[in-house]
Amino acid sequence: SEAMGISCGKGPRVAVLMGGHSLEREVSLVSGQACSAALRGKEFQVIELDAGRDVVQRLSELRPDVVFNALHGRWGEDGSIQGLLEWLRIPYTHSGVMASALAMDKQRSKHIFSNSGLPTAPGFMIEKSGLLTSHPLDKPYVVKPINEGSSIGVYFVNPKEDPPLKVASDMPSILR
């Protein structure tokens, strides 16, 4: 981790976690910098922290009063960083561990929403290997990784135009 910028406000010390090592690193850096700029205008002591593998050490050294979580995708939104912050006893902005983990898992989220009476689009889970020889549907469909954020790994497939092997080989390794 790297402390990217520290401001000298009078208020609480806020560490803005950004960057990280997910596929959404770049957008997280932009979000984190925007959050930092907004907080600086409000009398906070802002510490910009690019969350790398030494994030535990850096947070332990910096001892912020609170962490503003601007991490995106895996590790930032899946309950991992939330669990780490709870273990370190550092308050943070974001949903808790369980809510984050459930929200990041598309299949479990869909199950919870459906069982709560909320309408959801039709869908089912398929392994990447299930796309090697045939299409699971005859009409156009969307493939999305079960545990990525934003539009990472989203593919629109037209079975009439895209051979199954090409679809499977074009899929990133983030699909199982």
Regions found by a protein language model. Give the residues of each.
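ATP-binding N-terminal substructure of ATP-dependent carboxylate-amine bond-forming enzymes
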Residues: 1-115, 127-134
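Conserved ATP-binding module of the ATP-grasp superfamily
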Residues: 46, 120, 152-176
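ATP-grasp fold ATP-binding core
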Residues: 113-114, 137-156, 174-176
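Short acidic/polar capping segments at secondary-structure boundaries
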Residues: 98, 126-131, 146-150, 160-163
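Intrinsically disordered, low-complexity boundary segments flanking structured domains
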Residues: 128-132, 141-143, 171
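Intrinsic-disorder/low-complexity coil detector
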Residues: 11, 63, 135, 139, ...
